[in-house]
A protein has these predicted regions:
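Short loop/turn segments that connect beta-strands within beta-propeller blades
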Residues: 26-30, 67-71, 113-117, 167-171
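Beta-rich, blade/repeat-based domains predominating
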Residues: 1-9, 39-51, 57, 83-95, ...
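Loop/turn-rich, solvent-exposed surfaces of beta-rich toroidal or solenoidal domains
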Residues: 84-118
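Conserved beta-strand positions in repeat-built beta-propeller and related beta-rich domains
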Residues: 13-19, 54-60, 101-105, 155-159
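Structural signal for beta-propeller blades
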Residues: 21-22, 62-64, 108-109, 161-163
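A short beta-strand motif characteristic of beta-propeller blades
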Residues: 31-37, 75-84, 121-123, 128-134
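Blade-loop segments of beta-propeller domains
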Residues: 1-44
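Blade-level signature of beta-propeller repeat domains, shared across WD40, Kelch, NHL, RCC1
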Residues: 145-171
């Protein structure tokens, strides 16, 4: 099934979870114009871009760099803290020169330096889950979108009945 999306150069790039390939669509017609196979990464979880290249997560600690023209993986960095690697990187967003990555089954979003993989901060969204309607199918934090005009982040989760717009403030 479909996973991460990113828009770059009038194209929509979409990942598939376990099918080992991505899809490319024309941003205006929404027609599929291309497919691409994953390289060393085996799954597709999250996708973002910096205006030049694409960054892809596969559920591991790696962030893969994709060339938007050839769609080849051209390297990677490992996300890490001073205690070790940070695994289960999921949905990605590019925010002011950093990669925001939620971690599967966690309530936080890591702020990652894309040049070296260093985790520079973690945003704790645990309190948001207390504001959604409780039900048996309620699941994890698992969706983000950044609005550069308002500098806000939209955050939600699987089977959540609310979408939160938050502004990140540094202390």
């Amino acid at each position: 099934f479909g996973e991460g999306l990113s828009v770059l150069n009038d194209k929509i790039y979409q990942l598939t979870w376990r099918e080992g390939r991505g899809l490319v669509y024309d941003v205006n017609s929404l027609e599929q114009i291309e497919t691409f196979n994953y390289g060393q990464s085996k799954e597709g979880w999250g996708l973002c871009n910096d205006g030049k290249k694409l960054y892809k997560s596969d559920g591991s600690e790696f962030l893969w760099f994709l060339n938007p023209i050839t769609l080849a993986e051209e390297g990677s960095v490992q996300a890490y803290t001073n205690k070790g690697k940070l695994t289960n990187l999921n949905e990605l967003e590019w925010v002011d020169g950093k990669i925001y990555a939620n971690r599967y089954q966690k309530n936080g979003v890591a702020i990652i330096n894309p040049n070296n993989g260093a985790i520079e901060a973690v945003i704790d969204f645990k309190a948001l889950k207390t504001k959604v309607t409780k039900h048996q199918g309620l699941d994890v934090l698992n969706g983000m979108a950044y609005n550069p005009q308002t500098k806000t982040l939209f955050v939600t989760g699987k089977r959540w009945d609310k979408l939160f717009e938050v502004r990140i403030i540094e202390n």
